[in-house]
């Protein structure tokens, strides 16, 4: 047993915290950086969703690589990549440069996350201590994501948008030597199977498909867009075929033949996607439409993210008491009702009502994520628990990335249709960030007219998308109720 095991836990939690904070901190900074970099609507979406998309494809292979060459080594490399990418992101001078930096952050995160969990399990040999350590990891995970918007708001109140990335650097400078000193080295298992080619196929397929979807919504189905979509979907189909035919796949898709696992993965995908997509769009409405400062926007969003963090632990107790089927389906139904009610609410005049609705939404999605985990892990055979966990973590990250894409392209598409360009300025109907940039540059009464028209169009788009997503989640609630009809009361995982 490691004598310094609790210090090792502190070290890996320090390494883990920036990763989870980075999942939400950028939402608050998007309006500021979009204007500063002159980012288009599609570029804004890439800045946000490239991070979880890269993570979704690399989490499993990076975990396997760490098994092969040692967790300490991969963790240190991941921390170095994360720190360097944070510097590159903070000082990016263009949207494409920031997108590349965010992709590098995703690579660093995909190296850090599996090592953190593996080191906890390796360091704490006593079952009771390991459970305590994993509980601390869970709290840090939820709290980090919850405080992200607030931390972002505080930083942007005093510094420029790059500060939300630069804040990672001093943490890395402390964590790297601490990990080097405290975490013991290990030789790893050279027999562990590592298949980087499959990961590259998955990441390339995801990026090309998402690019095609975004381009198609913005400019229509051109030849270039159609070819991109065809290649992207083809790569994803190829990846799926490899997984099904392989004796040792990167992701065991055969688990999806079990209805509870399939619907659980769908819940993880939808819940994480809805939370991420809604946070992004809400942050833009609060700052662009309602003229709130980043700090005010962060405080406004706090009920949502805190309730989501609380929903997970409470969801396990609810599932044990009332059964997985009832809790899973009702959490999705509550989320759908909350989204629909928010779409009808005035965020200014009904601020307190909206705050309550945000609590309901966040709590419901948090419970839904925990219920999805119980459905997946509780239905997987014991010998495939690791494969089920890999499928769940990939689905969670993929849901976050694609949720942002879906929310973003729908909002931008409806915004373009609803926008009445009073001055006929170029580009202002593409996205609200481009419209607000143009309004500031033009100034005067013309600039004011553009800003007013953009705000009205975005508010309409936001409300319409919330109704669409609410309807989708309501259908999922019914599907969950049907698919989990034989699910017993389950212990939380």
Regions picked out by a protein language model, each given a short descriptive name:
Residues 56, 83-84, 169-176, 236, ...:
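Small-residue-rich packing faces within the transmembrane alpha-helices of Major Facilitator Superfamily
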Residues 49-63, 113-117, 302-314:
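Central cavity-lining transmembrane alpha-helices of secondary-active solute carriers
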Residues 5-21, 26-28, 37, 41, ...:
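12-transmembrane solute porter fold
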Residues 33-34, 65-66, 151-159, 213, ...:
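Interfacial helix-cap and linker-helix signal at transmembrane-aqueous boundaries
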Residues 19, 48-51, 55, 106, ...:
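Structural signature of transmembrane alpha-helices in multi-pass secondary transporters
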Residues 1-2, 444-453, 483-493:
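Intrinsic disorder in cytosolic terminal tails and internal cytosolic loops
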Residues 135, 157-269, 274, 281, ...:
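Hydrophobic transmembrane-helix bundles of small-molecule transporters
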Residues 64-197, 348:
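Helix-loop-helix hairpins in multi-pass membrane proteins, especially solute transporters
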């Amino acid at each position: 047993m490691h004598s310094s095991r609790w210090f090792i836990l502190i070290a890996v939690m320090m390494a883990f915290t920036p990763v989870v904070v980075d999942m939400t901190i950028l939402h608050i900074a998007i309006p500021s950086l979009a204007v500063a970099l002159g980012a288009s609507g599609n570029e804004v979406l890439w800045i946000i969703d490239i991070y979880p998309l890269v993570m979704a494809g690399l989490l499993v292979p990076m975990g396997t690589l760490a098994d092969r060459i040692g967790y300490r080594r991969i963790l240190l490399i991941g921390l170095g990549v994360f720190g360097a990418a944070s510097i590159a992101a903070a000082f990016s001078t263009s949207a494409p440069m920031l997108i590349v930096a965010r992709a590098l952050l995703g690579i660093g995160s995909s190296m850090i996350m599996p090592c953190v969990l593996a080191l906890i399990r390796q360091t704490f040999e006593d079952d009771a201590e390991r459970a305590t350590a994993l509980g601390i990891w869970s709290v840090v995970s939820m709290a980090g994501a919850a405080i992200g918007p607030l931390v972002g708001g505080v930083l942007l109140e005093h510094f420029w948008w790059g500060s939300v990335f630069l804040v990672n650097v001093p943490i890395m400078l402390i964590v790297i030597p601490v990990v080097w000193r405290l975490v013991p080295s290990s030789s790893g298992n050279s027999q562990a199977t590592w298949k980087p080619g499959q990961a590259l196929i998955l990441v390339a397929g995801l990026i090309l498909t998402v690019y095609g979807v975004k381009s198609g919504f913005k400019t229509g189905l051109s030849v270039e867009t159609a070819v991109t979509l065809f290649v992207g979907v083809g790569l994803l189909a190829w990846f799926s075929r490899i997984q099904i035919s392989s004796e040792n796949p990167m992701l065991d898709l055969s688990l999806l033949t079990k209805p509870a696992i399939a619907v659980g993965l769908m819940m993880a995908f939808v819940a994480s996607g809805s939370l991420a997509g809604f946070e992004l769009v809400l942050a833009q409405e609060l700052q662009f439409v309602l003229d709130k400062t980043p700090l005010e926007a962060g405080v406004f969003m706090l009920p949502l993210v805190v309730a989501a963090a609380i929903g997970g632990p409470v969801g396990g107790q609810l599932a044990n008491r009332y059964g997985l089927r009832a809790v899973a389906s009702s959490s999705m139904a509550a989320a759908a009702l909350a989204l629909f009610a928010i779409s009808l609410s005035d965020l200014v005049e009904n601020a307190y009502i909206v705050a309550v609705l945000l609590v309901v939404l966040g709590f419901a999605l948090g419970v839904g994520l925990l219920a999805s985990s119980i459905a997946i892990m509780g239905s997987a055979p014991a010998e495939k628990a690791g494969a089920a966990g890999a499928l769940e973590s990939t689905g969670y990250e993929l849901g976050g990335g694609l949720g942002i894409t879906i929310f973003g392209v729908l909002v931008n598409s409806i915004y373009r249709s609803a926008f009445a360009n009073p001055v006929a300025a170029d580009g202002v109907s593409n996205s609200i960030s481009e419209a607000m940039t143009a309004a500031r540059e033009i100034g005067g009464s013309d600039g004011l007219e553009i800003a007013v028209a953009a705000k009205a169009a975005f508010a309409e788009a936001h409300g319409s998308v919330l109704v669409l997503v609410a309807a989708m989640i309501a259908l999922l609630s019914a599907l969950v109720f049907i698919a989990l009809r034989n699910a017993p009361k389950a212990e939380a995982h």
